[in-house]
């Protein structure tokens, strides 16, 4: 799903969940090539063509406008230089989540929980650890032993990052989520400083196991471990915006 459409869908779900019109929802998606920059993205060098200005989100009620560190044809946002060809083949979004820069693309699983956080934990840091546990459990299903790295958010294998997290909680409801590298091309990460961590090297399940991974199997594992970690029963629905009965 194109990132902008997924973002708009998230925000529709957020509004409905905030008003208790729907129950908690967990989206699992893949995106076409997309760079996103969170609220903690550091300034650096990037030349943006007039046609590829980073896109801003529609505002939620009570939000102030975002001021992205980009200016057309100038400097800002990226910590490394993106060529015109790079920009031409990827969308660019300045988003309202925490964290810095990241890349999404085919072969990467992205999970977006839209949930009332207090039902699971009152601690945002505990929530981040729970998302890490979901990814670590899914990796273990494929005999990949992963770890947390002290001082950083996300999931690591042998010092290389395989899972990233960037979230936002508004009035107790979560948005955004995590990404797990499965079969995706890792080269685009070299054009940015992922998650503001200089010198970080990204990896993927297929790179570690040296074989193509069956995506539905990983998606099933992520879903199962999400249910385990958050102690919920998962049910697939065709329209999560359909009001629930309370």
Name each model feature, range by range.
Residues 102, 109, 173-186:
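Conserved phosphate/anionic-ligand binding catalytic regions in large, soluble enzymes, centered on
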Residues 160-162, 171-173, 184-187, 200:
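Coil-to-beta-strand transition motifs
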Residues 113-116, 169, 180-184, 206-209, ...:
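Short, structured patches in soluble enzyme cores that scaffold and shape functional sites
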